[in-house]
Amino acid sequence: MTKEVIVESFELDHTIVKAPYVRLISEEFGPKGDRITNFDVRLVQPNQNSIETAGLHTIEHLLAKLIRQRIDGMIDCSPFGCRTGFHLIMWGKHSSTDIAKVIKSSLEEIATGITWEDVPGTTLESCGNYKDHSLFAAKEWAQLIIDQGISDDPFSRHVI
């Protein structure tokens, strides 16, 4: 017997969201009461744009480090297959506003302060596709997203 499963992100109407934004997807509790929060960190407007793989890959590696420097509890930050943003999984209770501030600060550092030497995991030994990176593209996208402003509401522009 096949279990009926609803995947929340496929239920979201991608035509009415207004990127860039941070959206709380879900808050779940483990068997011992541990809280996990899942965020939609949408950097570009769905079905209108996407970040090319090399730039997104470099942003992914940088966010893995920069988010952890700014807030406790990060489990994982993984890119969407559609290349419009990331799932951010966190331990504990966090608000969309708190996460939007962390993302904004991280993107500001990518746009203005990061050099190639700062990008973690760019060697054959540390990355499964180490040749597919672009700091230039990561910086360009980060600045574009900052210029648009990051909202803590996916449906109306409430820029933090």
Swiss-Prot record:
Keyword Transmembrane: no
Keywords assigned: Autoinducer synthesis, Iron, Lyase, Metal-binding, Quorum sensing
One MF annotation (Gene Ontology) recorded for this entry: iron ion binding
EC number per UniProt: 4.4.1.21
InterPro entries named among the record's database cross-references: LuxS_sf, Metalloenz_LuxS/M16, S-ribosylhomocysteinase
Record's cofactor remark: Binds 1 Fe cation per subunit.
Obligatory cofactor(s): Fe cation
Catalytic activity: S-(5-deoxy-D-ribos-5-yl)-L-homocysteine = (S)-4,5-dihydroxypentane-2,3-dione + L-homocysteine
Tree of life domain: Bacteria
One Pfam family in the UniProt entry: LuxS
Gene3D superfamilies found in the cross-reference section: S-ribosylhomocysteinase (LuxS)
GO BP term (any one): quorum sensing
Binding, Fe cation: 57, 61, 127
Biological role stated in the UniProt entry: Involved in the synthesis of autoinducer 2 (AI-2) which is secreted by bacteria and is used to communicate both the cell density and the metabolic potential of the environment. The regulation of gene expression in response to changes in cell density is called quorum sensing. Catalyzes the transformation of S-ribosylhomocysteine (RHC) to homocysteine (HC) and 4,5-dihydroxy-2,3-pentadione (DPD).
Family: Belongs to the LuxS family.
Subunit structure: Homodimer.
Protein name (record): S-ribosylhomocysteine lyase
Organism encoding this protein: Streptococcus pyogenes serotype M1
Gene: luxS
